[in-house]
């Protein structure tokens, strides 16, 4: 799923006043978290380095693949929209949906990828 596809989907499902550059920033934050907390800690990570997205990256594929991408990215963007609008009840529902989808992806990733070995160092 590309950045543009998820932004168009969320704008269709939840019309809002936020510009694409704000949503791209939110997606960068989410993918940076996924990269640092999950992907980078396992062997065979298909991403060597993640620096975030810019407005020129709208056709770029997001890091989390289907079938998880749709639920994770849409729920996350909707939660950010709700939070910024001060709609806390809606935010709680959206962030709960996001947390559930993100945890499901994390568990699947952990099952399919071996964690990197941890080097033990002794300090004298």
Where do the PLM segments sit?
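Conserved short "hinge" loops at termini or chain/domain junctions
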Residues: 1-62, 103-124
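Short helix-capping/linker segments at secondary-structure and domain boundaries
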Residues: 81-91
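Short loop/turn segments at secondary-structure transitions that flank enzyme active sites
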Residues: 1-3, 80-83
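Elongated alpha-helical scaffolds
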Residues: 67-76, 80
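Short secondary-structure subsegments characteristic of cysteine-rich extracellular domains
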Residues: 92-106
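Generic detector of ordered secondary-structure context
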Residues: 22, 69-70, 90
